[in-house]
Amino acid sequence: MLQGKALDLKELIRPYYLKWIYFPVSDNHCPPEFKRWRQYPSVPLELAKQIVSSASDGLPDALFLPMTDWHGIRQRSQQMARGFSGLGHRCFYLNPHLGREFPQVYPLSQKRLLTSLEPRIAELHVHLLREPVFHHRRLNREEVETVTAGILAMLQATESSRQLSIVGLPVWTDVALRLREALHTPIVYDCHDLLEGFDGIGQDVLDQEGELFASADLVVFSAEWLAHEHISRRPELAGKAVVIRNGADSQHFAGVVRNSGGGPVTVGYIGALNSWFDIQAIRAAASEHPDWRFLLVGPTGSGFPKNAFAGLKNIQLIGEVGYQDLPAWMARFDVATIPFLIQPLTMATNPVKLYEYFACGLPVVSSPLAEVARYSDLVYLAGDPAEFVRQLERAVQENDPSKRDARRTVAIRENWRSRSETLIAELAKIAGV
């Protein structure tokens, strides 16, 4: 009981501490995704029609209840929304921070805002009193009602007549169920990670995944290994499950040409650095080749030690960069890497970065992940640090234009628009959308 009250008190105090003390102390303290959002035009819901296009005839609106902030690292949910919008669907994307992104504390702020992101894509912001960390715990009844009411008000303001819910994290299960009860909105669970492999996911959120599996009209898995793992536990999923892998926005990377400046061999990585990153593989390669340069581009998580590359001056931690800047960084790479430890979390992943590397034609050295091994003729697989070094040496020496062309062909074929088309077709079979 006392522990629960302490948690309640901490949640009530945290928004004031963050916005009045922690964020103002340093510009670096405020998450970059919050700053990026504030650069877009936002309006109260009653003015929604000023920034949202009219619904397309015959096409349902797509409600994305995601695992990721739109303004953070570009991941599956953002790309699927872009795919849907490219097919004519309006997309509404819920910001998962539930008020923490607002510059003002709850009593002083707007409670609902709609942000215009791109043509046919808008982002809903709902401010909750406690601003709960969305992957730490289940939403309570009042919070579910507030989020649901915000979505319903948005749909009314934008004259939405048909919708489908694409749920990327089980914390939104109760919201999706309320929407289905009120509007007969089909529920898609887009399961793209083995959630139990993350340290920061609350146990009651993990418990909710079973409820979401049971209630979803369609379950989409992003990887074959992930699908097999869950269906082996819940055989009843087999009748409503489909594998739809990740993809690439190949046009975004189409102009990438290796910078020919005569500099050192450059080995690159794009993505988060956390507990699943194989530090020893990169250390071994950097130690063996001190004349090479290693560029690791992406945010570091709490599971990544600060001294991971102590003593290795040829390794640069670049930090998070905007999606628009990724092509310029990849143009510096001679070889791209996916150095992941082999564990259930990584075996369940279908790395977006693989398709993005392919879109640039880059040779890729990777741990033997199940989804990467499907392209064994186009990648260099390495099962331990010593082999990782050897495969990097092979990849650096690659001089086969046909392989670069083949990789680009894969990226063009495995695009986000086609993934969205497949999802719509699969949902139509089950829910009549």
Annotated model-derived regions:
Residues 225, 244-247:
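Carbohydrate-associated surface elements
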Residues 80, 152-154, 202-219:
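Membrane-proximal helix-turn-helix segments that form the acceptor-binding/catalytic region
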Residues 71, 75, 277, 324-329, ...:
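Nucleotide-sugar-dependent
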